[in-house]
Amino acid sequence: MVFAQTLVARRLEDVWSIVPEGAIGRHWWVLTQRVFSHWPVRGGTQWTPQRLTWVAAMMAWDEGQTLDARWEHAREVAGRLHPHWSLGTSYSGFAAALVRESPRVVAGIKAKFREVMLAMESRHQTRCGWRAFAVDGSRVEAPLTEANEEGLGCAGREKSGPQVFLTTLWHMGLGLPWDFHLGPGTDSERRHLEQMLDDLPQHSLIVADAGFVGYELCQRVLKARRSFLLRVGGNIRLLTDLGWEHEERDGLVHLWPLAHRDLPPLVLRLIILRRGNQEIYLLTNVFDPKQLSDEDASVLYEMRWGIEVFYRSYKQTLSRRRLLSRTPATCLAECSWTMLGLWLLSLLTVTGIVAKGLDPLSWSVALARNAVRRAMRVSLRGRGGRLLRDLEAAVKDRYVRRGPKAARDYPRKKREKPPGPPKIQSASPKEIQTAKRLREKISTAA
């Protein structure tokens, strides 16, 4: 029984300070303590960063319908796998410790997860020659308490309640999260992305739907020496024939809103994709078609759908559409650890899938969820599990469907109108003169 419990612990434990272990084979990882060792802990502390991490991650996987139920189950599993741990006996004490420790612990675990992802096989790191990252935001509902209304705010649709705004960077090659940022429901996904730019690898390509295009964000990405491929809609005005470039090339446009006429216009490349009767307009700062062809741009933009599926997995597959915490601080902590739990589950699963020579994008969230929940139940019965084998087999079905999987006309399904074309206009004589004076002013200052 001791061996069985240790086996389950090893398989649930592949996480916080993860290093490649070639001797084991199949490229699985073993745990070391280096992630937690640099965080000093006072003697007698029950909820250390390591124990908080274990319990919070397993709460993210648990199928309980209340926070108390998830916490009791996760605490029991952690106690079974680590009998020497002295764990607190109240959920309120755990929640207070989680809120207090989350900022430093979450940042440390994110960094470790990214190290592991960068160490994966190079052939899965890129798509169409780019280390591409999709970005998107989503709101998660929070309980309608007075504290949440005041601290989180109400945004989105009319009569909506308090929400947490979650913005995620998703690695399009590995199908894994790369980073995420949280804030009140009134936050901006553009501001969230700006705060995550510095943790992106050099020469990354950011792929996003309409809503991210703006002068300030594009300028910030350019200064960070990253590239982008952003859909643009009818709320954006683009200029041609401005004369800012010495050589006006086909496909070049200028993003130069009135509010930023004291700054240089952004020279960008416009890509127009045609799909049936629909046209999709994309802006990029990659001018060379050899580096990013129209065909590759089409493939990458279509792959951006993976982040939408990721949010569906978070909300529906894990049944985390609505947070359960009653204060803003605990809501943000709950959302953060649900994200880390899903990230960990995907990391464990994708590692096994890649070791078998399969595409990491083939992993099934539902099968991985079932496997880890079964392992948690098995650990309480004192029997060894088969978590690694189950996660390696957690891949999507490969058969070709003959009809839609979803109901024909789900009554509450959102059917948003796609963005219209941007307003593309030739620069007026006044705009050309303004640009000329600005260029002369910049040249004189230099």
Kindly give the residue locations of the regions a language model identified.
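Single, function-defining residue in the core of a domain
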Residues: M1-H73, S86, L98-E101, G108-K112, ...
